[in-house]
């Protein structure tokens, strides 16, 4: 089973940059998107064989997630937890027979960490949500989680210390999540791989120089690890400032 997660930085824009060709090439069972920046009625496109589920922000052209799936989920829910988390279209949960899939676009802490307090609240609440799901069946948690966990996960850790996405507080929340029975699939398989990034600034020719950050993840319940065949990053795929990340699971 192949699952893909990709922050497309505006799906309408990405559709004009080969998104449908990518879907045909990827041959994924599930495609999770973040930062769709649209409502489903804003773009017509043909993607045969996939059911589509959308969660759009109240604010037009902002945030948003989508899940395209070949297998009909047992259930699909949108957002989670308290009311404050229910306006930006950031989470879709699809239940499958063997696991829950949670597609997430984590709030950015913003310049000067101006949204860090909300981000901390979000992190505590999403961890609680994932742990509650995990009590029922294993979880696959994927998306743009807006944090580079360790220094190996970005090109320039020293100059980015305390910038949004690499603050001590954000990194500690990821550590706390992983200590709660979850595993970062890519780092589990490739603990020492350097230069493996999923996002590059549009400035300073960052992608050409591979001056990037690994902020897109597939995180799974630890008991799912025996089924993980591979976890990878596809930096050669363009169309966004992020590239897709991939998880391959053995069938149960």
List the predicted regions and their residue ranges.
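Conserved beta strand-loop-helix elements of the APE1-like EEP
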Residues: 60-75, 204-226
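Active-site-proximal beta-strand elements of phosphoester/diester hydrolases
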Residues: 1-9, 98-110, 142
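Metal-dependent phosphoesterases centered on the DNase I-like endonuclease/exonuclease/phosphatase
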Residues: 30, 51, 122-211, 215
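Structured beta-strand-rich core segments of catalytic domains in phosphoester-bond hydrolases
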Residues: 37, 43-109
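Active-site beta-strand/loop signature of hydrolases that rely on acidic residues for catalysis
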Residues: 7, 23-41, 101, 130-151, ...
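Surface polyanion/phosphate-binding segment centered on an Asp-His-Pro turn
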Residues: 232-252
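Surface-exposed cleft-lining segments at the edges of enzyme active sites
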Residues: 81-82, 107-123, 158-162
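N-terminal, active-site-proximal structural segment of metallo-dependent hydrolase catalytic domains
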Residues: 1-47, 51, 57-63, 78
């Amino acid at each position: 089973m192949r699952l893909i997660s990709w922050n497309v930085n505006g799906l309408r824009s990405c559709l004009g940059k080969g998104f449908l060709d990518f879907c045909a090439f990827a041959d994924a069972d599930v495609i999770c998107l973040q930062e769709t920046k649209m409502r489903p009625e804003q773009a017509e496109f043909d993607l045969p064989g996939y059911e589509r589920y959308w969660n759009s922000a109240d604010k037009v052209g902002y945030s948003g997630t989508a899940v395209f799936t070949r297998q009909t989920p047992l259930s699909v829910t949108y957002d989670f937890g308290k009311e404050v988390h229910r306006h930006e279209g950031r989470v879709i949960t699809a239940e499958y027979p063997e696991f829950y899939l949670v597609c997430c676009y984590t709030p950015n802490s913003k310049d000067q960490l101006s949204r860090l307090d909300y981000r901390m609240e979000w992190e505590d609440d999403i961890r609680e949500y994932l742990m509650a799901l995990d009590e029922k069946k294993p979880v696959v948690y994927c998306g743009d989680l807006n944090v580079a966990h360790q220094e190996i996960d970005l090109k320039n850790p020293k100059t980015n210390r305390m910038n949004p996405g690499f603050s001590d507080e954000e990194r500690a929340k990821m550590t706390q999540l992983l200590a709660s029975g979850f595993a970062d699939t890519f780092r589990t398989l490739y603990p020492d791989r350097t230069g493996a990034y999923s996002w590059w600034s549009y400035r300073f020719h960052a992608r050409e120089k591979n001056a990037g950050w690994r902020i897109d993840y597939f995180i799974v319940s630890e008991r799912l690890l025996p089924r993980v065949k591979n976890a990878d990053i596809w930096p050669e795929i363009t169309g966004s400032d992020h590239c897709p990340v991939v998880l391959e699971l053995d069938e149960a």
